[in-house]
From Swiss-Prot:
Cofactor(s) for this UniProt protein: Zn(2+)
EC code(s) of this entry: 3.6.1.-
Principal location listed in the UniProt entry: cytoplasm
Compartments (UniProt record): Cytoplasm
Name of the protein described by the UniProt record: Small ribosomal subunit biogenesis GTPase RsgA
Subunit structure: Monomer. Associates with 30S ribosomal subunit, binds 16S rRNA.
Gene3D superfamilies for this protein: Nucleic acid-binding proteins, P-loop containing nucleotide triphosphate hydrolases, Probable gtpase engc, domain 3
Pfam family, one: RsgA_GTPase
Coiled-coil spans in chain: none
GO cellular component, one term: cytoplasm
Known function: One of several proteins that assist in the late maturation steps of the functional core of the 30S ribosomal subunit. Helps release RbfA from mature subunits. May play a role in the assembly of ribosomal proteins into the subunit. Circularly permuted GTPase that catalyzes slow GTP hydrolysis, GTPase activity is stimulated by the 30S ribosomal subunit.
């Protein structure tokens, strides 16, 4: 009887699953035990599994190990972090868009690394915008400044990617694919295929895959949080996803930091401890969510 081994699901092929063995790195095409269908058990890219290899070089997945998280659209399990790629022109990423991405990452309990990309294209006015963004976010999230063209920041970014499952996020055109090519040129063909796949239309159903970095770690081939949808968040829950709000003392324990008196968050905004843009974006999202609930 073959001994069970452990691996990670990296892709699907019809009703078969490709598993990468955690010790050898070998990729095994596996089928699922009947119990998955009978018990309606789901399996996703990123799942860590136990499988039994057979004499033909294939295998059978026996169990899915503990899943720490599950992202949707696309479904990917056990993601460690979001690499949020931001540009200040071509296209410009507003602080509102940045904060929406960050809310989704916080809701999913994911670490975030902010990447200011296309640094080689910026003039002095653009660099001023970069410095303003740094002032807002540098105490909240790690920031890496990059250029796929010059190689700036690529080695630093690799250190964040090493040994983790990452998903890239950011507006279309910020250079996610180009960054991946610069980080790991061996991904180039696959990344270009993914770019074409994504451009076929937002309603195209795609199955995510994990692309492996030569230096260790994986990246999901489909950007995370592509539709920036926050409608499943309750208005009263939103404050939990602005990390700098957490230690502020308010008179009311259930303060939403909007129109309540004696609010520690509003006081912190007035004192310059919390960036005005962060607070304004919070209030805008709060009323958006409140409006949807009333419909």
């Amino acid at each position: 009887m073959s001994l069970r081994r452990r691996g990670i699901v990296v892709s699907f092929h019809s009703n078969m699953v490709t598993v990468e063995d955690e010790e050898t790195g070998e990729r095994i095409l596996c089928k699922l035990r009947g119990k998955f269908r009978l018990q309606n058990l789901k399996i996703y890219v990123g799942d860590r599994v136990e499988y039994t290899p057979d004499e033909t070089g294939s295998g059978v997945i026996e169990n899915v190990l503990h899943r720490k998280n599950l992202l949707t659209k696309p479904h990917v399990a056990n993601v460690d972090q979001v690499i949020l790629v931001v540009t200040v022109k071509m296209p410009e990423t507003s602080t509102y868009i940045i904060d929406k991405f960050l809310v989704l990452a916080e809701k999913n309990e994911l670490e975030t690394v902010m990447v200011f990309n296309k640094m080689d294209l910026y003039d002095e006015a653009d660099l001023k915008k970069v410095r303003e963004l740094e002032e807002i976010y540098s105490e909240l999230y790690p920031i890496v400044k990059t250029s796929a063209k010059t190689g700036m920041g690529i080695e630093e970014l690799k250190e964040y990617l090493k040994g983790k499952i990452s998903t890239m996020a950011g507006l279309s055109g910020v250079g996610k694919s180009s960054l991946l090519n610069a980080i790991n040129p061996g991904l180039k063909l696959r990344v270009s295929e993914v770019s074409e796949k994504l451009q076929r239309g937002r309603h195209t159903t795609t199955t995510a895959q994990l692309l492996k970095f030569d230096f260790g770690g994986y990246v999901v081939d489909t950007p995370g949080f592509a539709n920036l949808e926050i409608s499943d968040i309750e208005p009263e829950e939103l404050k939990n996803y602005f990390k700098e709000f957490g230690d502020k003392q308010c008179f009311f324990s259930d303060c939403n930091h909007v129109d309540e008196p004696d609010c520690g968050v509003k006081e912190a905004v007035e004192n310059g401890e919390i960036a005005e843009s962060r607070y304004e974006n919070y209030v805008k999202m709060f009323y958006e969510l409140l409006g949807r609930r009333k419909k």
